[in-house]
Amino acid sequence: MVKILFLTKGIHSSSARYRALFYQDSFIKDKYHTTHYGLSKKISNYLLALINVARFDIVFLQRKLVPIPYFFILRLLAKKIIYDFDDAIFLNSNGDLSKKRYKRFKYICEKSDLVFSGNQYLQSFAKKINSKTFILPTCLNTKAYQVKAKKSKEFIDLVWVGHKSTVKYLLAVIPNLEKANEKIKKLRIINISNVTLSSKKIKIKNVSWNERIQYQYIKSAWLGLAPLDESNWSKGKCAFKLLQYSAAGIPSISSNVGVNSELINHYQNGILIRKNSDWEQSIIKLLTDKRLYQTMKKNSLILAKDYDYKHNYQVMKNLITNEL
């Protein structure tokens, strides 16, 4: 029986959930043995991983840029190491290269047996260091989004799912959403995150993120919002919220950046925004053209099928079997 040790930032990390822990049940069904250690700020967790690592055939290090001395010891003790990442973690949040982060990133990629990147942009960095770098998109359980949810009779809901680290992208386009609301009147933003927002010109419903609750709110919305800025950091994003909206069968309006522009077929399964002023007219167009809306809704569901976790698991398992 092959034993896999997942090392992640912890169960509260979305990357850990969707790129590592999500697949534990599938591995177990295929007769693998899996264990998970969250590498939090406690030194004891790091030591526990080192003490036990020799018992495992594969170490799956997800996203964490551990200190080089720690990884050096991990490499000595581990039989095989897979490094997985889904953000431009070698950059500062402003898009500039971080010397400290890149040094760790380079060392970890170089010494790993396999590297999984979330998109082509990220792969381009890692593959220069390790030729065994493969793209594994962040996927989801599409069935989870096929819940029964009624749309509001009072509001036309625009949903956004995010985090305090990404709320700046939503804040940048709220003035444009407010302008759209001047014409449609009933718009409401459903903000699913850990940040509370408010506006005098458009209604905002703040929803604390919860795995099950998010399915209901996404499904009940009319449109999904995915704003980004034009930065290298944004290019490292893997467009997961677009997949969430698509799985729920709602069209998306997104910035024409990075993976967003790869997933969205303009005016087929969503609308790509090139400048902030386009948000207003795109929302109005999509909500007033019923035929266009229904076409995009149908095509959104088709897109989501290609990113179901079951397909991704088979790709991951084949890479582990054939490349390690």
Segments predicted by a language model, with ranges:
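Membrane-proximal helix-turn-helix segments that form the acceptor-binding/catalytic region
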Residues: 47-55, 69-77, 97-115, 128
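Conserved acidic donor-binding segment of nucleotide-sugar-dependent glycosyltransferases
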Residues: 266-277, 285-291
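A short, well-ordered alpha-helix in the C-terminal region of glycosyltransferases
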Residues: 292-306, 318
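Carbohydrate-associated surface elements
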Residues: 121, 139
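Conserved catalytic-core segment of nucleotide-activated headgroup transferases in glycan assembly
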Residues: 11-26, 141-144, 153-219
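C-terminal alpha-helical cap of glycosyltransferases
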Residues: 309-324
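Nucleotide-sugar-dependent
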Residues: 165-168, 212-217, 222-247, 254-262
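A short, histidine- and acid-enriched strand-loop-helix "catalytic/donor-clamping" loop
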Residues: 82-97, 111-114
